[in-house]
From Swiss-Prot:
It comes from Phanerochaete chrysosporium (strain RP-78 / ATCC MYA-4764 / FGSC 9002). It comes from the Eukaryota. Disulfide bonds join C97-C131, C283-C419, C315-C391. This is 4-O-methyl-glucuronoyl methylesterase 1. Substrate binds at K288, Q330, E338, W382. The keyword Disulfide bond applies. Residues 73-96 have a biased composition (Low complexity).
């Protein structure tokens, strides 16, 4: 009888214990978190940043993570090619457009005007704005991203396929050094379109659903530039090529890697990829990287950052204002102590954001007139939901000025775990895929928020003090 009573009591307790554990992909810790701090079997509570720990598939280990694999040599396969002068990936600067990496004496507490040149003169045409984008590109590199190298001396690529999985083997050589990496491509079934399959380059595999008829390349961006913590500075394939002292941040190095992938695809027709229809995506820290890649690489047709938060589709000034209103958000001062996503030079400005002659609305402006759709999650205050809404509104003025407002989308909802995809957003996502990768005539007017900012307030007139011009 005692045994029966004991088992009955245990049976009553166990469900409560299980329920007290966070489920797979659920939150299990972080600043201000008061919920479950242990995870269900088969998952481990993983610290993503000081504000958020998540139950990820796997088992706990006390051993440090293994170092990235060494570069692999390119094997012979059905197709290979070498380019001694691969096409330029990141856009350069025109000799007729005056650019500078910094603007001494600049100060503006509001969001800087994207429609004036560095000297204060107005942008009056689309051609003018192309020059303005070159100025913005130089400023972002000068203040926070670090220097983006130009095209390397050579890119060698080969492609092999086994079933529905392809392997793109890439070797990049510059200044007498070489690196190699080999991303895999999930290839749709059936006959490819005449120009090849559209492609999504997914940072660390991505988190969004990809429609049928679109290939997916899994980009191990953390091999290109490590991002464990601040000790990762200067580590990864990119730095093996350009040196550990290169000023490029991890995100800039990731963008450089995306450009080399596109170089390789352009030189490898057997991969049957349409290099005019490429998207890039990632979530959280990798969402920040996807946005940076879309901004720096003009061959990307569609950029899809997911829950990129501070350092992504939010603005530094707005995140600070959100923090000043008493909300626990990631700010510039905190993020530079967390990881190596930005150059060390950015540390000089995080305590005086007013001197930045740009903010991240202008990072997003580098994507225009190409397509950009971003998604945010208001359930997580540290993602700076008010800052995201304000920042994308400021960026939207650029797309509107260029006559392509429907090339820029945004949706901000809650009700799901960080980086878990809510089905309610799939129609908006698919609209952008259908239009910009699958060439369908569909409506992409998507720009919405649930206005759940945790009490933080967005007042547009306090931050956007310019009128949107019509550029021709």
């Amino acid at each position: 009888m005692k045994s029966a009573a004991y088992l009955a009591a245990l049976a009553a307790v166990l469900p409560a214990y299980v329920n007290a554990q966070a489920q797979e992909w659920g939150q299990c810790g972080g600043i201000g978190w008061t919920g479950a701090t242990t995870c269900v079997s088969g998952t481990v509570c993983t610290v993503l940043n000081p504000y958020y720990s998540q139950c990820l598939p796997g088992t706990a280990t006390t051993a440090p993570p293994p170092p990235p694999p060494p570069p692999t040599s390119v094997s012979s396969s059905s197709s290979s090619s070498t380019s001694s002068a691969p096409p330029s990936g990141p856009s350069g600067t025109s000799p007729t457009c005056s650019v500078a990496s910094t603007i001494p004496g600049f100060s503006n507490a509001a969001l800087p005007n994207p429609f004036v040149f560095n000297d204060g003169s107005p942008v009056q045409s689309k051609a003018d704005f192309t020059c303005r984008q070159q100025q913005i590109l130089a400023l972002i590199q000068g203040y926070e991203a670090g220097a983006l190298p130009g095209p390397p001396q050579s890119v060698t690529a080969s492609f092999s396929k086994s079933g529905s999985t392809g392997t793109l083997s890439i070797t990049v050589t510059d200044n007498g050094k070489s690196i190699s990496f080999a991303p895999t491509i999930s290839i749709p079934s059936g006959t490819p379109p005449a120009n090849g399959w559209p492609l999504v380059i997914a940072f660390e595999g991505g988190s969004i659903p990809i429609p049928a008829g679109i290939a997916k390349l899994t980009y191990s961006n953390s091999d290109m530039a490590q991002q464990t913590d601040t000790s990762s500075r200067g580590k990864g394939l990119f730095y093996n090529l350009y040196g550990s002292g290169a000023t490029a941040s991890a995100m800039t190095a990731w963008a450089w890697g995306v450009s080399r992938i596109i170089d390789a695809l352009e030189k490898t027709p057997s991969a049957q990829i349409n290099t005019q229809r490429i998207a890039v995506t990632g979530c959280s820290r990798d969402g920040k990287g996807a946005l940076m890649a879309g901004a720096l690489e003009p061959r990307i047709a569609l950029t899809i950052p997911q829950e990129s938060g501070s350092g992504g589709d939010t603005c530094w000034r707005l995140s600070k204002a959100e923090s000043d209103q008493g909300h626990q958000v990631q700010t510039a001062t905190e993020i530079v102590t967390e990881n190596v996503w930005f150059s060390t030079n950015f540390n000089n400005y995080v305590n005086n954001l007013n001197v930045l002659p740009y903010d991240h609305h202008m990072l997003m402006a580098l994507v225009a007139p190409r397509a950009l759709v971003s998604f945010e999650n208001t359930d997580y205050t540290w993602l700076s939901p008010m800052s995201a809404w304000g920042c994308v509104n400021a960026a939207h003025t650029v797309f509107s000025a260029l006559g392509v407002a429907d090339h820029h989308g945004f949706a901000q909802v809650g009700g799901h775990a960080h980086c878990a995809w809510p089905d309610s957003l799939t129609p908006s996502l698919n609209a952008f895929f259908n239009r910009f990768l699958l060439d369908q005539n569909v409506d992409t007017n998507v720009f919405t928020t649930n206005n759940q900012f945790g009490g933080a307030t967005w007042t547009q007139s306090s931050w956007i003090n310019w009128s949107t011009p019509t550029l021709s």
